[in-house]
Swiss-Prot record:
Residues 321-326 are annotated as: Selectivity filter part 3. Belongs to the TrkH potassium transport family. The gene is trkH. Residues 110-115 are annotated as: Selectivity filter part 1. InterPro entries: Cat_transpt (IPR003445), TrkH (IPR004772). GO terms for biological process: potassium ion transmembrane transport. It is found in: Cell inner membrane. Low-affinity potassium transport system. Interacts with Trk system potassium uptake protein TrkA and requires TrkE for transport activity. This is Trk system potassium uptake protein TrkH. Residues 1-2, 58-65, 151-177 are cytoplasmic. Residues 30-35, 116-124, 203-205, 225-234, 327-334, 422-423, 444-455 are periplasmic. It holds the Pfam family TrkH. It comes from Haemophilus influenzae (strain ATCC 51907 / DSM 11121 / KW20 / Rd). Residues 438-443 are annotated as: Selectivity filter part 4.
Amino acid sequence: MRILSIIRIIGILVMCFSGTMLVPAFVALIYGDGGGKAFMQAFMLSLIAGTLLWWPCHHHKQELRSRDGFLIVVAFWLVLGSLATLPLLLFDSPHLTIASAVFEAFSGLTTTGATVMTGLDNLPKSILFYRQFLQWLGGMGIIVLAVAIIPLLGIGGTQLYRAESSGPLKDQKSLPKISEVAKALWIIYASLTVLCAIAYWLSGMNLFDAIGHSFSTISNGGFSTHDASIGYFNQASIYWVTTIFMLIGGVNFSLHISAFLALGKRNIWRNYWKDPEFRFFLTMQIIFIGIVSLSLYGYGLVSDINEAVTKGALQLTSMSMTAGYTIFDIDNLPPFIGLLLVISAVIGGCGGSTTGGLKAIRTLILWKQIDRELHSLIHPNLVQPIRIGKNRLAPRMIESIWAFFIIFILVYWGCVFAVILCGMNTFDAMGAVFATLTNAGPGLGFIHESFIGVPESAKLVFSFAMICGRLEMFSLIVLFIPSYWKK
């Protein structure tokens, strides 16, 4: 284990992250809301912390191994989340406890979208911008965004990319060099954000709301600058902009990269449609949106079919992309609709996207595995390999997906048990852990709108669940294996 080299890298990344505090400080200056001091203090403290980590180890530039990448990813997320709490603690309004600030910061960085803050409409613009900006930074994963500069630091970036990337096919690279992948991600991610902000602005949002919501829409984070979430605007055009860009953020970004490289060369739509996961993902979205829309109309929750489709598409997409935007009180929806929303959140979006959940590719492979087992019962001698497109999946790949599913269940019930010990009842604990572990945001029970009333200790458990969900279990759980720390 190259501990000193790892500390050096963490220090450099923390120093880079400290610079992000200057952006909301500039926003505070523009609006004159008095928040600049808190962000400048947070900037200085973060910069000092990064320097103290980096300087004693700055001569250690050993090449990282694969196992080192996992520790860097987890350590950086924990350190980053801790530093991200500083502005929230330094502000006089809102006045947050340490546990609440930790919860809010990790919810932003992991793009969960759950919140312990209320009265958003009356908060300083700079703190509202900061929450949105945190989700934008966390959307693609801080480490993936940083790998473009990792080669400049004297180490290779492949291990970090593999540890942070999501989805079971993450060993497949979209481009030969990881720095090129990261740069392409930056260009695409930033371009989509700008397009989303323009679309919001043209649809009637003011510039501040348009920029803020573009951050949380592309990242599928779900934070809003208003207590009523996206429902504050109550406008169909804004709802459709939200739905479309959430879906774009829910697509595997390797497909976006391929489409970006193929501009002007071939039919871009074919580039997406030939991907089995994308076809499964889009088909499931259309089916779920249709069912939810018809259900909303059938239950009389909307006035006409157009409103049903508009609101059904938004609410279903928000849950399935684990974004966290809400226009309905989920806890008071008919059980059938609520169940569909929960199922969609469990499935999530595509691997390699900004969404949470199990991911569409894993769901597709598990479905094919179940189908094969059922056919094997009928034809015991049948040899039927599982294929995704033209690729035949190795047994090891299928085993890893089942292992992920089992780990997901174990972590879920472990967190539920821990939250119950913190004082929450079973139903609320199950709903809250589901919301945080899948990074979906809205919970069930009394936390369906805000986590402000949960015990302080439970907020720390939820923060752990968010990190587990964001790093897809294994990247974090592997650190608890004793053999990981052996030479």
